[in-house]
Structure formats: structure tokens, C-alpha cells
Amino acid sequence: MYNHNKIEKKWQKYWLDNKTFKFVDNPNNPKKFYVLDMFPYPSGKGLHVGHPKGYTATDVISRFKRLNGYDVLHPIGWDAFGLPAEQYALETNNHPHTFTQQNIKIFRKQLQMIGFDFDYDKEVDTTDPQFYQWTQWIFVQLYKHNLAEIQDIDVNWCENLGTVLSNEEVVLNDKNERVSERGGHPVVRKPMKQWVLKIVDYADKLLDGLNEVEFSESLKSLQRNWIGKSIGTSVQFKIKDSLLTLDVFTTRIDTIYGVQYLVVAPEHPILKSITSEQQINVVQSYIEQTKKISDLDRIADTNKTGVFSGAYAINPINQEIIPIWVSDYVLMNFATGAVMGVPAHDERDYAFAKKYALPIKSVIDTKQKLPYAGDGLHINSAMINGLNIKQSQNVLNDYLIKNHLGKKVANYKLRNWIFSRQRYWGEPFPVLFDENNQIKIIEDLPVLLPNLNEFKPSKTGESPLANAQEWLYVEIDGKKYRRETNTMPQWAGSSWYFLAYILKNEDGSYTPLNSEEAKKRFAKWLPVDVYIGGQEHAVLHLLYSRFWHRFLYDIGVVPTKEPFYKVINQGMILGENNEKMSKSKGNVINPDDIIASHGADTLRIYEMFMGPLTASLPWNPDGLDAMRKWLDRVYRLYHNLSELEVVEDLNKLNEEIIIAYHTLIKNYTKAINEQAFNIAISEMMVFVNVLYKNKVINYELLDNFLILLSCYAPHLAEELYSLNHSESVCLQKMPIYDEQKIIAQNITIPIQINGKLKHTINVLRDTNAEELVNLALACEQVKQEIGDQPIKKQIVVVNKIINFVI
């Protein structure tokens, strides 16, 4: 057993001292590869064994591409702003900056212990003013292009966290209560002024962009469903005995003749004007009741509730008078906050009508049981009788548009991005307010985050930055301004950090994002070729970063519409019992312990050998032991060469070794290109078995095997390569396979008589048919089987078979 601790520390020091993995950007090399990990939040807990899975995958790709002559960008950085850091600071009575930097050092050391080929001169930190200067600059551009504004909106307020949360940061707990994703604290709806980024304006571009990238279908579906585009019609219904109108959205305008009631969201502002005196108390009580229910619960397939508003509307198509109901299954933040009730042709409407004894009118000819939502010819529908859905919708849309009663519209489930947080540890907004609350944008960036010792969030929603009196007020040209005291969310820095790696210079500075030099670099390095991270970021981070990147494309900063060409979500590493690792279950495994007992190379190769990268699989100590034994076997092979026969010319090795060698290189290459990392390891194992079996080696072959091994077990590969070489194995060239040498030259041909196998012969590949027949007939066993019987027919397939019919 080799001393992994000694070997791994030796080579980690060598790589750092010699800057082995220093980023290379050769202007004469058109081959580039940008492989990226979703950068970590540097928590005090450090890495667990799940982290190295994705990092090792990108490391294998990075090393492999470098061997193949690519300029490779494989960077690392820290997503260090945000709620988790601030919460931990409050709990431990520390300043977030102090322990964040301490945690980064711990994380960096752990990454170095695993042997990743990061160039740490390219490292980025979202809390670095040189970094967040450009986060602020992007916000300024969004504001200038009318994509950032302050709105009075109902927000998700978490009193325990003292901040507003985006819709995506709110989840349901076991009791179906709305809580914060981080910490599980109660969340309520509360009206507040907030900065909002208008991501909905980019909904169609984000949908279209999915056609240009290589994401899994499940990942694309998650994004499409989150955006939730629906095409329909907005129809104006007049309110009876009023000058008011109500805009109602429907995707089935063809069923408008079957409308028996309208339903509005409890938050709809029209209720204040149309609710009858008799129903005011009932409606108000229902509104208060709804505030306690989550949006997810409201739209869930459960028993629907509602109350009558006391008001009526007039159907613009047939002038029928229909009641207006209030129900929590209609959300104000989707479409118009009002829908048609067509119980004959919608399951939800049908259940609602049955519950409240509302009439049901069928307008599609069907023999099926109601409710029927399929296609068919329309009945009881005047101008569209006898038409199918598509025909009916065309006729009705034309009529409504012509008569100014409606229009075709697209609606989205996607909500605009609430972009401000009432917390301290985040990027300050480059925004000032004058005495009249008029906005002045700060162009001189960065706006630095002041050093506060007291940063506990208030219960009122006032940001801790309001306490920074010296920082808070600014005088410009004799006019006094107050700074924006909210900060940006953690998602801000992660929405563009992949560009920062390209801009980061060796001296620690950043090339300006809006410079010509930046454009030159982006032209070569974008998009990211492969981006690997957990599926938990499949919607939020991925959607936000795609939005920012597409915006930067639109204003001419970047040359690509999409930031990432291929995204892979790695599966989790579960506990031995197939449960998710957690402290409470006591099944968390620290990679430091594995490195100490088995070595970093063993950890790397085991996590890549567990199965497909995208699969979630249980940790298996036996599998870990098996990988260590295999690495020991490789080590022994190179230290026991005196027991093996050495052949100077690789091409003069026996056929089995030559075939195995070229097959290894071919299959290894294919496996890594397809991210089938476990298959590449299997191929290396098969090859080592062949070497042990034959007891014959060649030094070129042994060197080339170590080049392949270096992608997975770089420390051991370096150590063994250094036995005969002074340069790093990681900087060598990928060996090339010869397709012709994968094909065996000596092959076995079966000989059949009347279709039954009687004998085989060994011949050279491509031996012609005549020669094959002669060789077959020369075999004693074949001669005995045929005897004196005449051969009626001989069937010969070169390289395959010989069959004599007698």
C-alpha cells in the first residue's frame, strides 16, 4: 500500500509552487473549453462528500481537454454575500466579513487537498468591492433600460429573518404553512416598497433560448413550467348597473357562451367598488381568511371555497347577466385576477358550480359525461355553432378585437423578481433619493458597504444600513440625498460571476465589463461549454443568470444569447441507507476523513465510479475500499517492472495488449466526452488486468496509461510518471489510438457442415474465400465429417463463417 498522505501533499505543493494549472489564453489557439462548477457558499461547515462529486467531474473534463490541446478555463470562487452568512454572524456574534474570509480559507484548503486543477489567481469573491462594482453596474444598466423599478407590492415578509423573500425562497412545511426556505421561519404577505427586476419582460426570450442549449429535457421542463406561458384572450365584461368593466382572462374563449359566473381573486381591487352592502362583511371576512393561505394551497386540487360578491356582470357576447363570485383559487398575480366560470367544460368550474348550486350549460356537442374539456363542434353558441375549438377561437377573437371588447394576450406564471432585501450583508444599491423621493443613480462605482458592528434586522422592515448615519446621507452640488438602505439579494453576484472569471487578471484586478478588451475575451470564451451543479439551482439561479446574460447580450456587452451551452445536474451522494445526508441523521461524511484514511485519489475515483453523474446513489464503504485496492494494484505494477518482460517497440507487443491499449484510449475518450466517467474507469481497470495477465510491458505504453490516469488520480499519476520524467504528467498530450489496431488480425472462423458447427480455424483477417475453403478442407476433422460425400454447395462469408452443404 502506497503512502497517499506523503505523495498527495508532495504533489499539491508542487502544483501550487510551479503554478502547474495557471490559466493559459493563447491567442493563436482556436481550441478553448470553459468548464464551470456552480460556485459554493463558504459556510462554516466546510465541504461534505457530496461537493467533490461535481467538482471532480469538472476536474476530469478540464484535465482531459488540456491533454487534448485546448486552452482551458476551470475556475473557482465564492458566493459569499447573503442571508446564510448574516444569520450565522448574528448567531455567533461575529462580523460576516471576518468569518466569511475564514471560511473561504478552509474551503480553499479542502479543495487543494482533493487536487483540483483550479488556478487560484482566477478566484472570485462576490463580497470583493472590485467584483460587486460590476454587479452594481449591471443593476444601473437594468435601471436605465426600464427593467428595474420600485413598486408597491405585496411581498413575502419573514419577521424572524427580518427581510422580504422572493416567491422562490418560500416553501411549504409539513403543516402546509408558508415558511422560508432557509431556516423554516414563518412567512406572511405584507405590502412594501421594493426594487423589482422585470424578468417577465424577458419571458419569451428565456423560453426561446432553451432551444439553443443542451440541457436535459427535465431541466428544460422545469424552466418552461416555472415561466408558465399561456396564450389566451382578455375579455371585457361590463359590471351591471355600473360604468366599470372587468378584464377576464381565458385560454378557452370558445366556451364564452357557456359562462355561468365570473370569479375574481380576493385581492382584486374592483371588489371595493362592486361588492353589495349585503355582502361586504362576508367578502371582507373571506379576504382576511385568504391571507393565511399560501398561493400553492390556493391553486391545489382541493375543495374550492368562495363567496358571492353581490354584483353581476354582462356577457359581451350574448348579453346574459351572470353573478360575480370571489374565490381563493384565483390569484391576483396571474393574468387579470379574474376568470370565467364554465362548469360544463372545466373540472374546477364544475366542482365549484355543483358546490354552490350554480347553473351548468353545455356549449360543445358531446356524448361524454360532463365536464368535457376536449374538442368538438359547438352548440348553443350562436355565431360559432358547428365550429371546432380552433375555428371558434379565431371567429370570437376577431369579433372581440373588432368591437374593442377584448384582445389576444400571453400570460406567465413567472413573477417579476423582488430584488431588494432588508439585510446588511449584500451589495449596496447605487441609488440616492432626494427630499422628494426622486431617484438619482450613482455612476461612480463601487458604492462600498459600510462596516457596521450592529446589523441586526429590524422587525419593521427597515434595513440595518439605516443605522450607518455617516454613510447614509450624501451632499451633491449643495443638495442632500439619502442612500437606498436595502441591499441586493444573494442571487445578484451569482447571476454574472461566470463572466467575472474571464475578466479576472493575474494581479487581482478586473478588466472592465464594458470594455473592448472584455468583448475580445468574451468572444473567445463564451458560452460556458459545460456547467455542473445541483438540481436545486435548476430554476432560480439558472433562470436569473440567463436573464442577466440575455440582457447583457441585448445591450452589446456579451456576444452570446445564452451563458451556458450544456448544464448537467449531478445527483446527490446519499447516506448508506439511501437517505439524504444530514447532521440530524448522523450520516454526514467529511471528505477530510476519507482523504486521511484512503487518499484524495481514492475519493475522486470512487465518486466518479459510483455510477452515472446524474444519479443519486448511496455511499458504500466497500466500494471505497475497492477503489483503493485498485490504485494500490496500479502502484505495484509500476514498482515491480523488473518482474515483467520489457518490449522496446510498442508496436511489437503481443496482439492482445495492442488491441487493449488502443481500445482503452478510444473508449476512454468517448466516455469522458459523453460524461460517462465511470465507464472510463472501467476501461482502465480492464487494461490493467491485461497487463498483469501478459507480464509484458512497454515504457511508452506505461507513460500513456498514466496520462489517462492523471485525469482521475492525478497525485498517483504524477508520482509514478516522475519515476522516469521530470515534467508534470498533467501537461502531456493525450495519446492517440489507431482504429485499425483495435481490430484483431488473427481471427477464428467457425466451420459448419449442413449448418452445424463442426470445427474452427485461426486465420489472418481478410483471408479470401478460396483460401478459407482450402484451409477448411485441409482439417482432418472436416475431412472425416465429409468423407466421400459430394459437396453440393459451399457458403463462405469472409471473416465470418464457412458452411458446407453435403
UniProtKB/Swiss-Prot annotation:
Signal peptide coordinates: none
GO molecular function: aminoacyl-tRNA deacylase activity; ATP binding; leucine-tRNA ligase activity
Annotated residues for binding of ATP: 583
Superkingdom of the source species: Bacteria
InterPro entries linked to this entry: aa-tRNA-synth_I_CS (IPR001412), Leu-tRNA-ligase (IPR002302), Leu_tRNA-synth_edit (IPR025709), M/V/L/I-tRNA-synth_anticd-bd (IPR013155), Methionyl/Leucyl_tRNA_Synth (IPR015413), Rossmann-like_a/b/a_fold (IPR014729), tRNAsynth_Ia_anticodon-bd (IPR009080), Val/Leu/Ile-tRNA-synth_edit (IPR009008)
First-listed, main subcellular location of the protein, grouped into a coarse class: cytoplasm
Gene Ontology terms: cellular component: cytosol
Keyword Lipid biosynthesis: no
EC code(s) of this entry: 6.1.1.4
GO biological process entries: leucyl-tRNA aminoacylation
Keywords linked to the UniProt accession: Aminoacyl-tRNA synthetase, ATP-binding, Cytoplasm, Ligase, Nucleotide-binding, Protein biosynthesis
Localisation per UniProt entry: Cytoplasm
Chemical reaction(s) catalysed: tRNA(Leu) + L-leucine + ATP = L-leucyl-tRNA(Leu) + AMP + diphosphate
Sequence motif 'HIGH' region, location on chain: 40-51
Pfam families the record matches: Anticodon_1 (PF08264), tRNA-synt_1_2 (PF13603), tRNA-synt_1g (PF09334)
Motif ('KMSKS' region): 580-584
Family: Belongs to the class-I aminoacyl-tRNA synthetase family.
Protein's name in the database: Leucine--tRNA ligase
Source organism of the structure: Ureaplasma parvum serovar 3 (strain ATCC 700970)
